[in-house]
């Protein structure tokens, strides 16, 4: 399962885009989105999801 970004809570700071090791986070239109075909929840390389760990707003990057 991939992660998603709750657009209404996102501050559009861009931290998640630069932190994602798989390049799954991109700015599309007016918001950041996570490509579910690229997101693997950082399994195999990290103890936590990198997008969620750098997000300044709790519960903005969540399981889809």
Curated annotation (Swiss-Prot):
GO molecular function: 4 iron, 4 sulfur cluster binding; metal ion binding
Chain residues that bind [4Fe-4S] cluster 2: 20, 39, 42, 51
Protein's UniProt keywords contain Transport: yes
All copies of domain 4Fe-4S ferredoxin-type, residue ranges: 2-30
Pfam families, per database record: Fer4_7
SUPFAM superfamilies named in the record: 4Fe-4S ferredoxins (SSF54862)
Alphabetized PROSITE patterns for the sequence: 4FE4S_FER_1, 4FE4S_FER_2
Top-rank lineage group of the source organism: Bacteria
Cofactor(s) of this protein: [4Fe-4S] cluster
Note describing how the cofactor binds: Binds 2 [4Fe-4S] clusters.
Biological processes per GO annotation: nitrogen fixation
Keywords: 4Fe-4S, Electron transport, Iron, Iron-sulfur, Metal-binding, Nitrogen fixation, Plasmid, Repeat, Transport
Keyword Metal-binding: yes
Protein name: Ferredoxin-like protein in nif region
Chain sites annotated for binding [4Fe-4S] cluster 1: 10, 13, 16, 55
Gene3D superfamilies: 3.30.70.20
């Amino acid at each position: 399962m991939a992660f998603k970004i709750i657009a209404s809570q996102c501050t559009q700071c861009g931290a998640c885009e630069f932190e994602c090791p798989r390049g799954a986070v991109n700015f599309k239109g007016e918001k950041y989105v996570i490509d579910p075909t690229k997101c693997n929840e950082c399994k195999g390389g990290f103890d936590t999801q990198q997008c969620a760990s750098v997000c300044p707003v709790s519960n903005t990057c969540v399981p889809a």
